[in-house]
Amino acid sequence: MAAPGRKINFAAGPAKLPEEVLLKMQEEQLNFNNLGVSVIEMSHRSKEFGALLNETISLIRELMNVPDNFEILFMQGGGTGQFAAIPLNLKGDHEHADYIVTGAWSSKAADEAGKYINVKKVFQPSKPYVTVPDQENWVHDEKAAYLYYCANETVHGIEFTPTAPESHNVPLVADVSSNFMARPFDFKDHGVVFGGAQKNLGAAGLTIVIVRKDLIGKQQAITPSVFSYKEMIANNSLYNTPPTGGIYTTNLVLKWIKSKGGLQAIYELNLQKSGMIYDIIDNSNGFYHCAVDKRYRSIMNVCFRIGGPSGNDELEEKFLKGSIERNMISLKGHRSVGGIRASLYNAISVEETQVLATWMNEFQKLHNTN
């Protein structure tokens, strides 16, 4: 039962947190574990915070089944900070890195990486971003330092499903910011897996970086210490003051995921939620339109237009206004693409998704002239 005044929050990030997590945070805000202080007041060097940090690492390893040859780091700077940290840490003796550009975030990552390493795109990106070109047409180079991809493009609603791209014998680097723990993850061929916590795993300010051990120690001389994987590992993510409140929040979210049955159970719920919305789109006779190739539709960010492929601004404004009247917020699409975007992260329930589905059906009956 939702607390009074709570909205159904479909924001793309920062996003909804499970209510159980928020209530636990409220309960412990003044007095964490009977220590007489809040977590955000504790010394990051204290044994109590050290225990919390190590427990959080263990929960990530357990839930994602992270292999023993990977380290788990807590960093800052968001996913965007990792756009620079990746080439700074992984360049080694290599001259270039390969990038798969399928949307706004992988495009930004390639642009940022170009400051620190030569970037080669395995195919020429074409706009609008609606699909992932067939891999047999990609141009790979086994001399690349790594092959980078964004597992889920939040802005455009494109997700690598059900598996990662072929690595072609170089380490895969995955930005999983917007589908972190939304489904089971296969670490095969991966060298680095990273993401900001603010969509599926907690609050803004914490970046989780999972690094294969054999890739550590290849950082460029200009790498800032706070972005150095080697420094962070040597100091158990305590090289400088970490986002203590963010780590605490993620700890609670991880326990919530575990209580729900783990990643497979969460994945099945996410399939149910996204399927509910995509079914309405596909059966609307064009009233709702999702341009994304069905093979790569995101289960996290459902992007669509109303009134045809290019959208009808008047209809979309009416839809958003009606959504707010029905206690739903943050359904407006990203400013660069427009339309509607329903972000169905782990904390969004099936029941909340059903409220959106009901409104979509009602709205179509009111305004469909076909």
From Swiss-Prot:
Report the protein name in the record: Probable phosphoserine aminotransferase
Binding residues annotated for pyridoxal 5'-phosphate, in chain numbering: G79, T80, W105, T154, D175, Q198, N240, T241
Q: What class of enzyme is it?
A: transferase
- Kindly list the positions annotated as binding L-glutamate: R45
Q: What reaction is this protein's catalytic activity?
A: O-phospho-L-serine + 2-oxoglutarate = 3-phosphooxypyruvate + L-glutamate; 4-(phosphooxy)-L-threonine + 2-oxoglutarate = (R)-3-hydroxy-2-oxo-4-phosphooxybutanoate + L-glutamate
Cellular component (GO) terms are: cytoplasm
How does the record describe its quaternary structure? Homodimer.
- The UniProt record lists the keyword Transferase: yes
Keyword Chloroplast tagged? no
- Which organism is this protein's natural source? Caenorhabditis elegans
InterPro entries attached here?
Aminotrans_V_dom, Aminotrans_V_PyrdxlP_BS, Pser_aminoTfrase, PyrdxlP-dep_Trfase, PyrdxlP-dep_Trfase_major, PyrdxlP-dep_Trfase_small
The Swiss-Prot or TrEMBL record lists the needed cofactor(s) as: pyridoxal 5'-phosphate
The free-text note explaining how the cofactor binds reads:
Binds 1 pyridoxal phosphate per subunit.
Q: In which pathway does it act?
A: Amino-acid biosynthesis; L-serine biosynthesis; L-serine from 3-phospho-D-glycerate: step 2/3; Cofactor biosynthesis; pyridoxine 5'-phosphate biosynthesis; pyridoxine 5'-phosphate from D-erythrose 4-phosphate: step 3/5
| Example of a GO MF term | O-phospho-L-serine:2-oxoglutarate aminotransferase activity
Q: Report which superkingdom the organism of origin falls in.
A: Eukaryota
Spell out which residues are annotated as carrying N6-(pyridoxal phosphate)lysine. Answer: K199
Give GO terms for biological process. Answer: L-serine biosynthetic process
Question: What are the UniProt keywords, alphabetically?
Answer: Amino-acid biosynthesis, Aminotransferase, Pyridoxal phosphate, Serine biosynthesis, Transferase
Q: What does this protein do?
A: Catalyzes the reversible conversion of 3-phosphohydroxypyruvate to phosphoserine and of 3-hydroxy-2-oxo-4-phosphonooxybutanoate to phosphohydroxythreonine.
